[in-house]
Swiss-Prot record:
InterPro entries: Ribosomal_uS7, Ribosomal_uS7_bac/org-type, Ribosomal_uS7_CS, Ribosomal_uS7_dom, Ribosomal_uS7_dom_sf. One of the primary rRNA binding proteins, it binds directly to 16S rRNA where it nucleates assembly of the head domain of the 30S subunit. Is located at the subunit interface close to the decoding center, probably blocks exit of the E-site tRNA. This is Small ribosomal subunit protein uS7. GO terms for cellular component: small ribosomal subunit. It comes from the Bacteria. Keywords: Ribonucleoprotein, Ribosomal protein, RNA-binding, rRNA-binding, tRNA-binding. One of its GO terms (molecular function) is tRNA binding. Belongs to the universal ribosomal protein uS7 family. Part of the 30S ribosomal subunit. Contacts proteins S9 and S11.
Length: 160
């Protein structure tokens, strides 16, 4: 692994329908085995289902869900004197949204509905209303960071 310079961040184009880079990243996370058209179909169909069932703007619901699930703190493992400590660190915005989308997708796939469209629609709606498994995951992460607040003086190098 080269240490000369950091890798360049790829430019991700916004999605066609809502012109949003955040939604485009979410679609890329849904995508499996390069089947982007299928991932787009799942997301846009879930948006249609949200609009029909709950009579709310699906894009606004998506943004609210992502904002509600995005963590502000997480713990990173730091080795000090032969012992590993779970040190709470702040999460930057890009990583926060990446974690949020991953948690929403995992929570949706574990739901009991039959089709991924239904699962995703319900999980997004619940997350936008501060309910659901993805919100619980965020709260657990924050509790873990709060419990390990005593080790915050062992901040990792990236925080200095």
């Amino acid at each position: 692994m080269s240490r000369r310079h950091a890798a360049e961040k790829r430019v991700i184009l916004p999605d066609m329908k809502y012109n949003s880079i955040l939604l485009s990243r979410f679609i890329n996370n849904i995508m499996k085995e390069g089947k982007k058209a299928l991932a787009e179909k799942i997301v846009y169909s879930a948006f249609n289902k949200i609009e029909k069932k709950h009579r709310v703007d699906p894009y606004q619901t998506f943004n609210n869900a992502m904002h509600n699930v995005k963590p502000h703190l997480e713990v990173t493992s730091v080795r000090v004197g032969g012992a590993n400590y779970q040190v709470p660190t702040h999460v930057d915005e890009r990583r926060g949204y990446a974690l949020a989308s991953r948690w929403i997708i995992n929570a949706a796939s574990k739901r009991s509905e039959k089709m991924m469209i239904d699962k995703l629609a319900e999980e997004l709606f619940e997350a936008s209303n501060n309910r659901g498994v993805a919100i619980k995951k965020k709260e657990d992460t924050h509790k873990m960071a709060e419990a390990n607040k005593a080790f915050s003086h062992f901040s990792p190098k990236k925080m200095k």
